[in-house]
A protein has these predicted regions:
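Conserved N-terminal helical subregion
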Residues: 119-236, 241-253
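N-terminal mitochondrial targeting presequence
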Residues: 1-40
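Glycine-rich FAD pyrophosphate-binding loop
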Residues: 45-47, 61-95
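Short beta-strand to alpha-helix junction loop
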Residues: 95-101, 146-173, 302-303, 337-340, ...
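Beta1/beta-strand and adjacent pyrophosphate-binding region of the FAD-binding site
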Residues: 35-52, 72
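C-terminal helical "tail/cap" subdomain of flavin- and related membrane-associated enzymes
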Residues: 351, 412-491
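N-terminal FAD cofactor-binding segment of flavoenzymes
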Residues: 59, 84-134
Length: 491
């Protein structure tokens, strides 16, 4: 069990700003001009105010060893609506995150989870996953595998929470910190360059962040939590390698039939064009994540609400041939689906989700999918976390969990560096973070990428082989099912 950030030992007093320089200054670098005004000096500057960046700011302020650091967070968007978020009871946003137990433990530790409204959180402890071509299926049910509700083992696979809800809770916990970070929103990063020698400090290896307001911030440590197109990563000259999938993820929020007679499960069906998933929300609500081609996503967006609902219901009931045909209809999908379902034998709930009855207005949206991995996570006085370091296909629901795992690791190693008298921007402090996170993240990226490729085949020898593999997992031979489920609960 990993050590709590809040109880890492403190071995020494807070240290002075100026640390030893560990690298020679390259003449090819961009430097602040001699006439530039002196920037405001921070221990840590975080670029990016999404869930990962906010978690980092909250964790730095909550951990005993790092809570004396002077921190600034920069976000281009307006954080006001997120801070003031007050949702309607009968409405859920379309961007939902699946938080695994280890992520929730960290959120509790840094004081965020108490600000998450439990009436808007849906936990689930079972999944139904099946092959859209062969019907081979694996059922992940923690209650069956680990002794039911009376067991001492936590049987929760994940907790479904709206993105904006999580960010709202993080902002609330940041507001409670004794030493609050400087929160700079509605402001873009215009330029990042290296500093200069001043009367107080030698900042020639310090990143200087110039904002759209003209304000300048000097960072003992600059952290990029600024997404897949990270300006911080670009400044550091770190390559990010990977590829686009030529797939988009369609998201939407639905009302569903009464499912009170069935357990709250997540459902995922692997179709050759991409997986389609229904994820549970509180009450009679559910969330869609359908990865498919850009053309099919455009078709789904263009459908009338009743036809779109019929199309999603069909995705869990009809053959791939039928689904492919329905994608060619511009209207009348509901009627056509009703007839095709009447002549098709398909499973019943809880093996498949209950029927969707309505799509919430304004919740249909999509975004492109890609797999990217930075060559490294750290540079001179610089670190990357979350999507700035790695971007993953959403089929496994691990993107944000991996990012928050990065945060835990980075804060832990910063605290360790402080305890050993090291400069927080030095390679001695930062390299252990990369060593701990890079290979596990790379393995997860590779596994999900291969899974995407494997289920893209409609015919050929791999189709029966993958079905055999699914059957072996479902029977829990060699404890494979338990192993996969336990790994899914870790960041």
């Amino acid at each position: 069990m990993r050590q709590s950030l809040l109880h890492l030992p403190i071995k020494r007093s807070p240290w002075a700003f100026q640390g030893s320089r560990l690298a020679r200054i390259s003449a090819a670098r961009s430097y602040a001009s001699e006439s530039s005004p002196n920037p405001e000096v921070y221990d840590v500057v975080v670029v990016g105010g999404g869930p990962v960046g906010l978690t980092l700011a909250a964790a730095l302020g909550a951990a005993r060893t790092t809570n004396n650091l002077k921190v600034a967070l920069i976000e281009g968007m307006n954080l006001g609506p997120t801070r003031d978020w007050n949702p309607k009871p009968e409405y859920f946003a379309n961007r939902i995150v699946s938080l695994i137990p280890s992520t929730v433990r960290l959120l509790k530790e840094i004081g965020t989870w108490k600000h998450i409204r439990q009436d808007r959180v849906q936990s689930y402890d079972g999944m139904q996953v099946w092959d859209g071509m062969t019907g081979s299926r694996v059922e992940f049910d923690w209650n069956k595998l680990w002794g039911g509700k009376d067991s001492q083992t936590d049987t929760t696979i994940a907790h479904m929470v709206e993105n904006i809800h999580l960010s709202h809770g993080l902002l609330k916990s940041i507001d409670e910190l004794a030493l609050k970070p400087t929160m700079i929103d509605k402001t873009k990063v215009e330029k990042i360059e290296y500093g200069k020698m001043t009367n107080e400090l030698d900042m020639r290896d310090w990143p200087i962040v110039t904002l759209s307001t003209g304000q300048k911030l000097a960072a003992r440590l600059l952290i990029g939590a600024d997404g897949g197109n990270s300006p911080v990563r670009t400044f550091a000259g770190i390559e990010s390698r990977g590829w686009d999938y030529d797939r988009h993820s369609m998201v939407a929020t639905f009302r569903i039939e009464d499912d009170s007679l069935f357990p709250k499960f997540a459902y995922q069906r692997f179709l050759p064009s991409g997986p389609v998933a229904i994820l549970p929300l509180p009450g009679n609500f559910a969330n869609l994540a359908w990865s498919t081609t850009p053309e099919k996503v455009a078709h789904l967006k263009s459908l009338a609400p009743e036809d779109f609902v019929a199309m999603v219901n069909a995705a869990f009931r009809l053959s791939y041939t039928d689904i492919d045909y329905l994608h060619n209809l511009k209207s009348g999908v509901a009627e056509e689906t009703k007839w095709r379902e009447s002549v098709t034998k398909y499973p019943e709930p809880p093996q498949i989700p209950v029927r969707i009855t309505e799509v919430l207005e304004g919740t249909r949206a999509s975004f492109p999918l890609k797999m990217k991995h930075a060559d490294k996570y750290v540079g001179e006085r610089l670190a990357l976390v979350g999507d700035a370091a790695h971007t993953i296909h959403p089929m496994a629901g691990q993107g944000l969990n991996s990012g928050i795992g990065d945060v835990y690791s980075l804060v832990k190693h910063l605290a360790d560096g402080i305890n050993h008298g090291q400069d927080i921007g030095s390679s001695f402090t930062l390299e252990p973070y990369q060593a701990e996170r890079y290979l596990p993240n790379n393995a997860l990226l590779g596994f999900v990428d291969k899974l995407h490729t494997l289920y893209g085949f409609e015919t050929g020898p791999l189709v029966p082989l993958r079905s055999l593999g699914v059957e072996i997992i479902n029977k829990d031979w060699f404890g494979l099912k338990r192993f996969l489920m336990s790994q899914a609960a870790k960041s």
